[in-house]
Amino acid sequence: MEYTYQYSWIIPFIPLPVPMLIGVGLLLFPTATKNLRRMWAFPSIFLLSIVMILSVYLSIQQINRSFIYQYVWSWTINNDFSFEFGHLIDPLTSIMLILITTVGILVLFYSDNYMSHDQGYLRFFAYMSFFNTSMLGLVTSSNLIQIYIFWELVGMCSYLLIGFWFTRPSAATACQKAFVTNRVGDFGLLLGILGLYWITGSFEFRDLFQILNNLIYNNEVPFLFLTLCYFLLFAGAVAKSAQFPLHVWLPDAMEGPTPISALIHAATMVAAGIFLVARLLPLFIIIPYIMNFISLIGIITVLLGATLALAQKDIKRGLAYSTMSQLGYMMLALGMGSYRAALFHLITHAYSKALLFLGSGSIIHSMEAIVGYSPDKSQNMVLMGGLKKHVPITKTAFLVGTLSLCGIPPLACFWSKDEILNDSWLYSPIFAIIACSTAGLTAFYMFRIYLLTFEGHFNVHFQNYNGQKSSSCYSISLWGKEVPKTIKNHFCLLSLLTMNNNERASFFSNKTYQIDGNGKNRIRPFITITNFVTKNTFSYPHESDNTMLFSMVILVLFTLFVGVVGIPFAFNQEEIHLDILSKLLNPSINLLHPNSNNSVDWYEFVTNASFSVSIAFFGIFIASFLYKPIYSSLQNLNLLNSFSKRGSNRILGDRIRNGIYDWSYNRGYIDAFYTISLTQGIRGLAELIHFLDRRLIDGITNGFGLTSFFFGEGIKYVGGGRISSYLLLYYSLY
């Protein structure tokens, strides 16, 4: 067992051979590597599976032995400075390792089929494997320098994957936006790390905790400077986990392939910020102002993410704002000191959100056969509807993920979210009211997504929903280059509703985009499973292939049962705290709260749970009332669906609803504010500086030059070499 811990430093580097071999193969043997490209799914999954097995073994040892292991190598540069690097295995590391590997394996398995048609298949798997390597290195780091190195690698991989289809202008803009926004947080993180080193002289977590505790206890540290360092450290987590006000990159990150969205939102990039705050919580907890600030940012993000998700029409953007809101719950829990609740929600949310994103990928995959490779069509919920008849397995999986995120028992997110809500009442009643209200909003917007996607009629030819007569279609196989074919516009909705099934089928089949030699229907996936029966048709959306469905089914099982790890099994006060998660987190909980009592009053738990579940069902009821097909008007798919027109003068309630809808659909006008105040402000400042440089600075120097030139030209004629002219000038002056 000792050898397992000692050599666990190799864990982050196990997936690394895949991107290295792909790169070498493309350089030395490009033709053979491209011809055998489908084989790279197997080594990617196999190597990550080895990491998963090691992670499970380490977690079992953590549960049984309850200790923290750290192995450090010292690199002495001179007598005054030595850099120590190594790896740290503790409960937080074990949880993150299992989370990254399990979600990563399922996403890779899913991606083999999802990306089979894409010319960038090899590039995709190289990026994905390096992404996993970077995240594994981040969670096993034993000091702040290592964390910063892998932190930057995670950001680089996310930049590459968000802009995977880089010839698509929106994708290129999105990856730049994510990169620049995260640079703000990363710069703050770097300054915070350097500030802590200036105070303590160490980057190691164990030294930081001990030295800072002693310095603060003896009042030997400048309090304001230390608080500033903590704020800067937290800024890195704010940007990476898409917390307000650095959240603007997250919805635009949906321009990348859907499997990337699943991995980023479940177990890698956005989880990195939560991991950093959890890792540094022993530092933050010393200063109450920092904890209050963390909880404040968390509760603002909870509410903002939920309100911005209310009116999104893009299915992936709606899920992105959902992720933002749920990350706010985790940050709120950390700010309240609820370490266990935050990590519990990180676990349950990861599997539920991965399921939802892979489900949305299956929906998009099926819609592309009808509307072509156009994100503004294949991801638009207004063009969906009635898909439960065509993609029943995807519908069931998506419903399970939706119910879990809504907090419906006994699904995974119910247990963790309810624990956060209970702790919030003890921390601040105002925060608790906001958190509980947001739980109702979560149920509303999640069921809105479900109802618009799976219930009602298939609205693929319902055009002009946003006032646009046409939109561009893109070919993923060409990395975003526009294709010449377009879907017929100005199609009447009434004819769609009145035509019979045969007419509908023939109409859709005539407008189907056929896929070329690289198409999905002509390439068999490297991994084939025959457990499910799917019906392929191009008249209506069809169920995804079995490889994609397999990953979704496994995530359904996780969503159903992963909540068990945090549920107390015994009902007496002596053993009530001996659930699996508490056993695993026992060393960390004792470090943060030496006299903590994890006992649970089941009567109080049931009472609070009944309240939160009632709020969730109320949100579901409102969503059903507004978006259920029997009440909905297909001509106005927004918050005004169920309200009849009352003449030209709308009442105040209509204006309020319109205002809420506009606020949500336009992202709270935060992006517009940043564009005006920052982007245009910086450009205006640059133009002003350019004007001053060209006109003022250059004008002064050029003016001196011109003055000297004309002065020289003037006196040149005076000194022409004639003595008579010199005498005349002399006598005229004197």
From Swiss-Prot:
Top-level taxon of the source organism: Eukaryota
One of the Pfam families matching this protein, by short name: Proton_antipo_C
Example GO biological process: ATP synthesis coupled electron transport
Keyword list, A-Z: Chloroplast, Membrane, NAD, NADP, Plastid, Plastoquinone, Quinone, Thylakoid, Translocase, Transmembrane, Transmembrane helix, Transport
Catalysis: reaction(s): a plastoquinone + NADH + (n+1) H(+)(in) = a plastoquinol + NAD(+) + n H(+)(out); a plastoquinone + NADPH + (n+1) H(+)(in) = a plastoquinol + NADP(+) + n H(+)(out)
Keyword NAD on entry: yes
Enzyme Commission number: 7.1.1.-
Family matches, as NCBIfam families: NDH_I_L, PRK06590.1
Name the UniProt record assigns to this protein: NAD(P)H-quinone oxidoreductase subunit 5, chloroplastic
